[in-house]
């Protein structure tokens, strides 16, 4: 067994974090920081601020919750862009095209754990004696013995599990070219897109200074579904989306989005949409052909708008039933597709 040459070398082989510095931290988080610095509408952050109209969380924990959700969201975008082989994110080249796959993956995964560490800061603000897992953890929890679990970590882990389950299903459908039903799609969206909305409202409820036992999770589940279906429509039928993310990028990704699912289901004997998804088109002609088919042959855009109008009506009704919320109504107005 060879001996170390000197004390410095010997020390460098002793496990520990004493050599870690801010320069290292900056270097490994750079792909995430790149995405995080891109200008966006921060819809989730605005939802959190609006929901606090009901829950009255103090400014310090409110800022932590906003930070956690933003970290998870932007880290997930880095991974999504890799899994979808995207080229643009908010009008800029995606992170993995600049930093490479390996650095981008590691950076995003690292930020997931940094976000979990941020949850430690919420413990002093957790409502004393508030141990109702029916309200906080909801029906999707896998926790069998709440008394033996840490509420904040349970919320965090459950919703990250849901997010990855939803994303996994979407990838399986895409790669196997298997069109889901609308019901399966809604369930997937509730897991994937709804996860961060639920995480936010559950953390807000856990830290609320308002003793109310109202369950706001169903409302935020509805928001998640509404938000994703609208995003699907905008991807195929909106000029602003084209400038920011690319023209009909969902078709290039082979994604079974809500309008596409309707188009396939409406004409089961017509394989045009399946064929387009299989080819993952990167140039306009095939995309324009599919969009024309969805708009004029199957009426899928009109159908999607009808569903969104119905969901919007439900959202407004739920908000009113919960006592009203001007901030949330402004966000519904912002996202509305009503002419």
UniProtKB/Swiss-Prot annotation:
Superkingdom per UniProt: Eukaryota
GO molecular function: (2E,6E)-farnesyl diphosphate synthase activity; dimethylallyltranstransferase activity; geranylgeranyl diphosphate synthase activity; metal ion binding
Annotated residues for binding of dimethylallyl diphosphate: 89, 192-193, 228, 235, 245, 255
A UniProt-annotated Pfam family: polyprenyl_synt
Catalytic reactions of this protein: isopentenyl diphosphate + dimethylallyl diphosphate = (2E)-geranyl diphosphate + diphosphate; isopentenyl diphosphate + (2E)-geranyl diphosphate = (2E,6E)-farnesyl diphosphate + diphosphate; isopentenyl diphosphate + (2E,6E)-farnesyl diphosphate = (2E,6E,10E)-geranylgeranyl diphosphate + diphosphate
GO terms, biological process: isoprenoid biosynthetic process
Involved pathway(s): Secondary metabolite biosynthesis
PANTHER family to which the protein is assigned, alphabetical: GERANYLGERANYL PYROPHOSPHATE SYNTHASE
Protein name as annotated: Geranylgeranyl pyrophosphate synthase AN1592
Organism annotation: Hericium erinaceus
